[in-house]
């Protein structure tokens, strides 16, 4: 990932590409590049760093041509270097391509290609497709792309150019791709803002679409070559609205980005046959005897989920701390303690200070981080990036679910290395993890039901959230989301704690959100729901599809797909995000910039 632009027409392609990439800068990136079809063939210029470095390089060697592709990259496979930047080319330089997403099976493909004599020049998964195209190309670029894509597995938006063809071909699955329609010219982009100076007629490609762009027109087929019809729409957006992808708020856009974000977090990391994961960490898991989780707010709830998984799957003793308290309690730390610091921004001062305290006492350190180049990335020994992309809404959504997935990956990694997690159980978990992006898509389809529930309860003065075991952090996060953006008072407790105090609050005016998905503690959760009902409370249950018992007990039920109980929080939190959002909108709140809050808290 991150930004894609393609152009074929009559203008100077370099100008269109650089302008489009600038309009996608808000997505974040660490390198950039373009390829232009010139009279001398395809010419590629790419640089790590900011677009200004690329523009400066292009200025020294102007590229003249009316067809080209451009990309801004946020590194997932390989460091942010010039060779790893896109576009990538075939070995003869006649084909260039750019790619958002992850090819999950790139390592096995790379090994097979190297065995057939191909030489790689980068560390990226994307270059694998360039070599596959070199093998499949027989004169028809679109057919070559279709055939090459049959070999890859994962999420992608791919755009390809060839020096002998006045056309661009592209395909998408999960990662977004938009066609812009002009007169005597046509465009491609990963997001609408790149297209707005040139056209407002666009086609949003669907999963499995393959497209050929020429100056004269656009041809769309599926992966088998069958023609498909896609409706062209007129976008009437301001630039700000375009950056929101047509959504009214960044928060809602980011909620809907979660399927492909989870693809990115998982991408290339699952090794199902071996029952393990590839995290690229230098840390030796056998040298860790205990973990101290250090985080704030939403990230701390991801860390609490991580504690449950590390202890369950890896039998690794794990302490969970609010970062602002950690260094003041004089924690017991030694050289076999791992300080696990979790932060979206990598700049949260309380987390940084907690980490520094642990390091002063001799702890090893690992960061689970979204923002590359942040302070936290420089202060930890190792980093597990979550690859969620820029998150602009102050209330975290996609970064949270990506952190949960990162915690699950880390727990499997430790569990297998420590001999605590059996092969069959690990394989089962990894298979379930691969399903998560699709399952989250299914949950997003429940938005109309969630909106109906929000309409019923948006005037409530208080909410109570309850969950057990791994769903306790989900309850905490659901309450936090509601507080952050609706300004409604909300509390969360492990469901078993309700009778130790909070039960005194329950009456006919209190909505109680209960995480009641299937799992080992399901029957105990049902008992908690009955306790709430007996005192007049209104129960909103998050339940597993097919559950016939819950509707007899709860006033409102939002179903989520069945998944391994340890992974249920990743799908269960999505309706809570939507519920908070819908209530805040009904109350007229500033969803993206709620009062008194900042995206990154850099003061103690």
UniProtKB/Swiss-Prot annotation:
GO molecular function: carbohydrate derivative binding; glutamine-fructose-6-phosphate transaminase (isomerizing) activity
Gene it is expressed from: glmS
Span of domain SIS: 281-420, 453-594
Protein's recorded name: Glutamine--fructose-6-phosphate aminotransferase [isomerizing]
Residues of the active site: 2 (nucleophile), 599 (for fru-6p isomerization activity)
Role noted for this protein: Catalyzes the first step in hexosamine metabolism, converting fructose-6P into glucosamine-6P using glutamine as a nitrogen source.
Quaternary organization: Homodimer.
GO CC entries: cytosol
Principal EC category: transferase
Disulphide bridges, residue numbers: none
Species in which this protein is naturally found: Thermus thermophilus (strain ATCC BAA-163 / DSM 7039 / HB27)
Protein's UniProt keywords contain Heme: no
Major localisation: cytoplasm
EC numbers, comma separated: 2.6.1.16
InterPro entries recorded: GATase_2_dom, GFAT, GFAT_N, GlmS/AgaS_SIS, GlmS/FrlB_SIS, Ntn_hydrolases_N, SIS_dom, SIS_dom_sf
Source domain of life: Bacteria
Subcellular localization, as worded in the UniProt entry: Cytoplasm
Keyword Transcription regulation: no
Catalytic reaction equation(s): D-fructose 6-phosphate + L-glutamine = D-glucosamine 6-phosphate + L-glutamate
Domain annotation Glutamine amidotransferase type-2: ranges: 2-216
GO process annotations (BP): carbohydrate metabolic process; fructose 6-phosphate metabolic process; protein N-linked glycosylation; UDP-N-acetylglucosamine metabolic process
Pfam families in the record: GATase_6, SIS
Record key words, sorted: Aminotransferase, Cytoplasm, Glutamine amidotransferase, Repeat, Transferase
């Amino acid at each position: 990932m991150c930004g894609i632009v393609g152009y074929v027409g009559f203008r100077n392609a370099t100008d269109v590409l650089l302008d489009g990439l600038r309009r996608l800068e808000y997505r974040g990136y660490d390198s950039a590049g373009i390829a232009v079809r010139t009279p001398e063939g395809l010419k590629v210029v790419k640089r790590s760093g900011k677009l200004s470095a690329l523009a400066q390089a292009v200025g020294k060697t102007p590229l003249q041509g009316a067809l080209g592709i451009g990309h801004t990259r946020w590194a997932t496979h390989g460091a942010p270097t010039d060779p790893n930047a896109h576009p990538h080319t075939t070995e003869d330089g006649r084909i260039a391509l750019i790619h958002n997403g992850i090819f999950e099976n790139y390592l096995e493909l790379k090994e097979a290609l190297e065995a057939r004599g191909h030489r790689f020049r980068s560390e990226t998964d994307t270059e694998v497709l360039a070599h596959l195209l070199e093998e499949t190309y027989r004169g028809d670029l679109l057919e070559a792309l279709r055939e090459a894509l049959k070999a890859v597995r994962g999420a992608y938006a791919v755009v390809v150019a060839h020096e002998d063809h006045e056309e661009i071909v592209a395909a998408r699955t999960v990662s977004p791709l938009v066609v812009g329609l002009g007169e005597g010219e046509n465009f491609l982009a990963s997001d609408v803002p790149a297209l707005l100076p040139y056209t407002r007629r666009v086609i949003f490609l669907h999963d499995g679409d393959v497209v050929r762009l020429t100056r004269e027109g656009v041809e769309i087929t599926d992966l088998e070559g069958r023609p498909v019809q896609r409706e062209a729409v007129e976008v009437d957006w301001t630039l700000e609205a375009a950056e929101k992808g047509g959504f009214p708020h960044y928060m809602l856009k980011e909620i809907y980005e979660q399927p492909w974000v989870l693809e990115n977090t998982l991408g290339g990391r699952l090794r199902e046959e071996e029952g393990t994961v590839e995290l690229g960490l230098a840390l030796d898991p056998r040298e860790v005897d205990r973990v101290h989780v250090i985080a704030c707010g939403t990230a701390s709830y991801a860390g609490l989920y991580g504690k449950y998984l590390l202890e369950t799957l890896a039998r690794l003793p794990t302490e969970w701390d609010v970062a602002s308290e950690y260094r003041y309690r004089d924690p017991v730390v030694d050289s076999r303690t791992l300080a696990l610091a979790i932060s979206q921004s990598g700049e949260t001062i309380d987390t940084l200070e907690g980490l520094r305290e642990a390091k002063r006492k001799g702890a090893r350190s690992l960061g689970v981080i979204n923002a590359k180049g942040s302070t936290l990335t420089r202060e930890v020994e190792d980093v597990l990036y979550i690859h969620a992309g820029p998150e602009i809404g102050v209330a975290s959504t996609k970064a949270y679910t990506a952190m949960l997935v990162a915690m699950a990956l880390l727990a499997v990694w430790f569990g297998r290395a420590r001999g605590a997690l059996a092969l069959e159980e690990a394989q089962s978990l990894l298979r379930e993890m691969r399903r998560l992006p699709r399952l989250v898509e299914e949950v997003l389809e429940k938005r109309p039901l969630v909106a109906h529930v929000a309409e019923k309860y948006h005037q409530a003065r208080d909410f109570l959230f309850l969950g057990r075991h791994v769903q306790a952090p989900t309850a905490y996060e659901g309450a936090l989301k509601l507080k952050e953006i609706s300004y409604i008072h909300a509390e969360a407790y492990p469901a078993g704690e309700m009778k130790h105090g909070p039960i005194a609050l329950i009456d006919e005016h209190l909505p109680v959100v209960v995480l009641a998905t299937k799992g080992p503690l399901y029957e105990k959760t049902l008992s908690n729901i009955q306790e709430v009902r007996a005192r007049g409370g209104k129960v909103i249950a998050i339940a597993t599809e097919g559950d016939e018992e819950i509707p007899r007990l709860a006033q409102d039920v939002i179903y989520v797909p069945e998944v391994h109980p340890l992974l249920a929080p990743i799908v269960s939190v999505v309706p809570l995000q939507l519920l908070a959002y819908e209530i805040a909108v009904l109350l007229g709140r500033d969803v993206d910039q709620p009062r008194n809050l900042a995206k990154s808290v850099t003061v103690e």
